[in-house]
């Protein structure tokens, strides 16, 4: 029987977890507009700057399954405290990195320790009744969007690239402060929520992967996810270098650009996507989002001024914001109830791999081909992704 005290504890834990998510993503987003200029201060070429992004994603790719299993074994609370506090120290290490190679190491360690998204999701699910989980996960998505909206603006305001690497220490310390505040909030306010582990054999991960890739909707959805995430991550990694080359931008301008795009993304995810899906269905909205991304990529490549480029960036953000919820929904709808977590986890790993390769490839295109080549290549790759989305449009009713 429910009592006011447990309900109050549940609400408090929910608020703290959402605050932790916001602070974590704000710290992550705070660093994004700084990395290209931080790398340049270390005399790194474009391809090495791109690796600064990929190193984090590679660490996160390895950290997600490790910390997820660890949270099942020792509990959510200790894993969250260790990973969040350790991630804060990784920002401090990055602030004092004297070479690009030590910066790579700091980013990798930070990414590994930030592989706690599944632990946060598990903690949120632990304290939420099944019938309320969808709405609470929506709140989690809003916290992500809000953190990514605020973080880049703060980073751009605090950075002083004219001072070399010293000019990036204050924003990196701010990111570390966000992390330490999150860890303290977990230590003080969050109670252990892990349920007793269930006994019994589980299907091998390779078998779950094989069945997922054999499904016509899931397989196509994962391919589209990989293409779009790799393209967007590559653009994200080289956007600072491209806008500096094209328009003479610095961290402040880039930070405010990401903030504006974050506002648009939050609106699209929180309000617009649901309305579009209710009216047209996920496959049609997914296809429209891919077309918008394709248009935006070309628009940016051909843009004569930054005003036009931002219109193109808005199209890309709009398309990406309505694509990913539809992809997740389609994959979830095609997955048996007892394999939701495993299958969606496989797609998360798939997207993490895309975030590793996308920035490296885009960095090579920037250095060896053309500063805006990543826009063109991503637009080309979106065309087969759109064809796959049209196939899902035909297959979804019978395959799901």
Summary of predicted features, one role per range:
Residues 78-93, 284-299:
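Structural signature of the two symmetry-related core transmembrane helices
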Residues 140-187:
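Helix-loop-helix hairpin linking two adjacent transmembrane segments in secondary transporters
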Residues 63-75, 268-282, 366:
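Helix-to-loop junctions at the C-terminal end of transmembrane segments
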Residues 177-196, 388-393:
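C-terminal membrane-cytosol helix-exit motif in multi-pass small-molecule transporters
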Residues 2-11, 191-223:
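Juxtamembrane intracellular "pre-TM" segments in multi-pass secondary transporters
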Residues 105-145:
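Cytoplasmic helix-loop-helix junction between adjacent transmembrane helices
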Residues 43, 75, 96-101, 303-304:
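Helix-breaking motifs and short loop linkers at transmembrane-helix boundaries and internal kinks
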Residues 33-47, 237-253:
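Short amphipathic helix-loop junctions that connect adjacent transmembrane helices
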């Amino acid at each position: 029987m429910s009592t006011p005290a447990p309900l109050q504890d549940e609400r408090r834990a929910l608020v703290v977890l959402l605050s932790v998510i916001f602070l974590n993503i704000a710290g992550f987003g705070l660093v994004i507009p700084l990395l290209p200029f931080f790398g340049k201060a270390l005399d790194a070429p474009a391809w090495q700057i791109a690796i600064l992004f990929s190193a984090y994603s590679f660490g996160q790719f390895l950290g997600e399954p490790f910390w997820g299993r660890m949270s099942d074994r020792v509990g959510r609370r200790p894993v969250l405290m260790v990973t969040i506090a350790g991630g804060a120290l990784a920002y401090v290490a990055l602030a004092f990195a004297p070479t690009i190679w030590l910066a790579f190491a700091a980013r990798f360690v930070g990414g590994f320790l930030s592989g706690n998204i599944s632990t946060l999701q598990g903690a949120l699910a632990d304290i939420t009744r099944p019938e309320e989980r969808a709405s609470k996960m929506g709140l989690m998505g809003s916290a992500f969007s809000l953190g990514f909206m605020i973080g880049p603006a703060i980073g751009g305001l605090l950075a002083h690239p004219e001072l070399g690497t010293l000019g990036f220490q204050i924003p990196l310390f701010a990111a570390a402060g966000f992390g330490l505040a999150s860890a303290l909030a977990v230590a003080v306010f969050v109670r252990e929520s892990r349920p007793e582990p269930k006994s019994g054999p589980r299907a091998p991960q390779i078998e779950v992967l094989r069945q997922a890739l054999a499904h016509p909707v899931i397989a196509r959805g994962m391919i589209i996810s990989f293409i779009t995430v790799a393209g967007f991550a590559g653009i994200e990694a080289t956007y600072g270098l491209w806008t500096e080359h094209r328009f003479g931008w610095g961290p402040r301008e880039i930070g405010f650009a990401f903030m504006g795009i974050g506002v648009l993304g939050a609106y699209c995810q929180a309000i617009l996507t649901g309305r579009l899906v209710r009216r047209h269905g996920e496959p049609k909205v997914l296809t429209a989002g891919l077309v918008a991304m394709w248009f935006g990529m070309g628009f940016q490549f051909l843009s004569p001024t930054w005003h036009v480029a931002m219109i193109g960036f808005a199209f890309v953000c709009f398309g990406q914001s309505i694509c990913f919820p539809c992809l997740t929904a389609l994959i979830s709808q095609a997955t048996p109830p007892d394999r939701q977590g495993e299958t969606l986890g496989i797609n998360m790993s798939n997207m993490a791999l895309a975030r590793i390769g996308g920035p490296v490839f885009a960095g090579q295109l920037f250095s060896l081909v053309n500063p805006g080549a990543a826009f063109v290549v991503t637009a080309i790759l979106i065309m087969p992704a759109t064809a796959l989305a049209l196939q899902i449009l035909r297959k979804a009713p019978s395959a799901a």
